[in-house]
Amino acid sequence: GKDQYARLDKISVALPHPDAAAAIIKGGTEITGHFGNPPFQEQELADNPNARIVLKSYDVQGGPGSATVLYATEKFRTESPRTYTAFVNALADAAEFIAAQPEQAADIYLKLTGAKTSRQLLLSVIRNPEVQFNITPQNTLGLGQFMHEVGAIKNRPQVLADYFFDDPRVASGS
């Protein structure tokens, strides 16, 4: 909650997800917890019998949350509209492809990343109803408002347009 939001900061370190997952899977390191995202959190649970779920962002945020948000400046968007549009369209196409072709999406992911993740585990992540692939923001406004309440950001967001560009695909988000 608001009064305890920074309580774990003094015992937290920032690590790339693959490194944190490797530490949890291996066990016996100073890394004993990981605020992860797919597929790393699923790998930890599958490969370390002592790993447990402590909390889920799905429960904390009251539903799905945007696991990844990409940033661009207004200057970039204005000066490079074709590049910006092509990039956002490619993200939307990828999200639609993953939802429509999960098996092929898993194969592409494994081939391009060289990840040692099991195909079956990856498919279970893609098909998990709590994991959604789309470009519509999900439960970001409440998080932004909480961040303002605790002083982590200066301006309190009122609407998505306070921090997302105007785009019909964003308008229905939260």
Report the location of each language-model feature.
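Short, polar/charged alpha-helical segment
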Residues: G1, E44, N139-Q145, Q158
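A local structural motif
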Residues: G1-P16, G27-I31, T117-R119, I153-L160
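Pocket-lining segment of extracytoplasmic ligand-binding domains
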Residues: K10-V13, P18-L110
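Short secondary-structure boundary/hinge segments and terminal tails
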Residues: E44, G62-G63, R127-N128, F164-D166
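Residue-level "edge-of-site" marker
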Residues: S57, L123, L160-A161
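Secondary-structure end/capping motifs
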Residues: T78-K154
